[in-house]
Curated annotation (Swiss-Prot):
PANTHER family, per the entry: DIPEPTIDYL-PEPTIDASE 5, SERINE PEPTIDASE S9 FAMILY MEMBER
UniProt signal peptide: 1-24
GO cellular component: periplasmic space
Recorded effect of pH on activity: Optimum pH is 6.7, using Lys-Ala-MCA as substrate.
Domain of life, per lineage: Bacteria
Protein name listed in UniProt: Dipeptidyl-peptidase 5
Keywords: Aminopeptidase, Hydrolase, Periplasm, Protease, Repeat, Serine protease, Signal, WD repeat
Amino acid sequence: MNKKIFSMMAASIIGSAAMTPSAGTNTGEHLTPELFMTLSRVSEMALSPDGKTAVYAVSFPDVKTNKATRELFTVNLDGSGRKQITDTESNEYAPAWMADGKRIAFMSNEGGSMQLWVMNADGTERRQLSNIEGGITGFLFSPDEKQVLFTKDIKFGKRTKDIYPDLDKATGRIITDLMYKHWDEWVETIPHPFIANATDGMITTGKDIMEGEPYEAPMKPWSGIEDFSWSPDGQNIAYASRKKTGMAYSLSTNSDIYIYNLTSGRTHNISEGMMGYDTYPKFSPDGKSIAWISMERDGYESDLKRLFVADLATGKRTHVNPTFDYNVDMIQWAPDSKGIYFLACKEAETNLWEITLKTGKIRQITQGQHDYADFSVRNDVMLAKRHSFELPDDLYRVNPKNGAAQAVTAENKAILDRLTPIACEKRWMKTTDGGNMLTWVVLPPDFDKNKKYPAILYCQGGPQNTVSQFWSFRWNLRLMAEQGYIVIAPNRHGVPGFGQKWNEQISGDYGGQNMRDYLTAVDEMKKEPYVDGDRIGAVGASYGGFSVYWLAGHHDKRFAAFIAHAGIFNLEMQYATTEEMWFANWDIGGPFWEKDNVVAQRTYATSPHKYVQNWDTPILMIHGELDFRILASQAMAAFDAAQLRGVPSEMLIYPDENHWVLQPQNALLFHRTFFGWLDRWLKK
């Protein structure tokens, strides 16, 4: 298989070059969309109990077959001994070490549905552990490994055939409440947690610890098994859930942390009265405390992520980082229970941090122009996953005391070494309200300041997502620069990582300061002699797509081309057709029919569809019909308006993609269409 050949190539070079995954001989190539689609993708990882070996998953996209295969690998933490331990036509997920360090548990769809499997650490003696009807979506063994918690989807609500059994071939859905759709699916199932004995042979069923409750755990669409935690004694399970349905669910972000006792079968809420989004519970190793991530306000999904710790004996809850103005993510207790490690993004760089609970002292462990995306700690050994604008995900060994990082893997070294390096600059720009805005400027390969280049303004989605050092297989800033463009990527008002005041400014101000920030970034870069001011485009997805539609009606000839992916064209239509109403209420300010709602009416007044009369610049719309967050009719309306206005326009519509573009051939079609459009209008 191709992946096997690639694995052998990678294994031959990692041992000697693990410290510098981008080092090697540059052959002067540039990254094309076709070459980009051959890059492998590192995903889940786990550190062995002795801290010496990592197991991790890698997916290999195949454009020809239009699918990706996922395999598992092990590697020593010095970068040596990399080995592919699975090689099947199925896909393997979520590898986890068993306590003896000799076996690895994982999920595989080898039998058709996703089930729990186990094998030796060298890949031998592969054995299926579960045969759960419909498959599982996640698993977590108890500390003594005698029990396993698994999650699976259960039926939710009544379907048409339940109401009319004689109409078993009818396809219509009878809807009676909100949240009938979510993200990219009709809500006919919800995930529930089950526990089962793991020592009695094949697992075919389990006890639903939320039996009879019509609520999600984990919470869709983002949460997974990380929202569960076993107590060290194996007697309790902590989990996060938003125990609401229908309209109440659509209006509220209020979730809570629950602890289920296996002996009594009782559940109690340890975050009762905390009205925001509570998630990611983790018992301390000594079993005395539990930590979790908490937002303060109901209905605000981008509120500050705070770190809370509760004393399990007294129930006392403590906000342990009250002066920390950055989001806390992916917490893990220190082995001695005296501190907690976490990820936090500060000024568009995501690094590893540690808080000492007794003193409240917070220490930044790692530094640098990159994003850490995951980590695991065993004793004094830390394994982390990291990427940047320039390099995709790889694994690194991090010294938790001084932050020194050594590369463990170099999955795409054979390809990356052939490419001409690119440069990424960090610039601070003064905004029109007197603020300071960090803007990334990504330069093309072989950049020559004496030449003129076309440029692209990258508009971020979210809207409250930092333009950090991300690596995306859709919106990839390196890929844009590799096509000969200067990429301008501002952290405009309304993104985290620069204090909560900066982050919150965008709420109720969609067409306001953040749009002026985009224009500021473009105007500042146009002062550079190497930027061709007549050949600048603006691109973006989701809120970035909204930004593009808005800029199309307000840019005063700054731009020569636009691309909007999954963007909002009509804010009133968006309010009436989206599913998570808490988001629309907080960000927009409320429904459009509240004529005396000043904030809402101000927001609706900035809706891009109200300024189509100003459209005069070529624009490409891209959208997926399975996008239930922002319906594809938004792109259709924008395209029709552009066509009727006589504005050069195209639309790429996917019947089988959601808010993202996930299938390999569709992804390559996205890139070819994207760059074809930009080249057509910006490289004349």
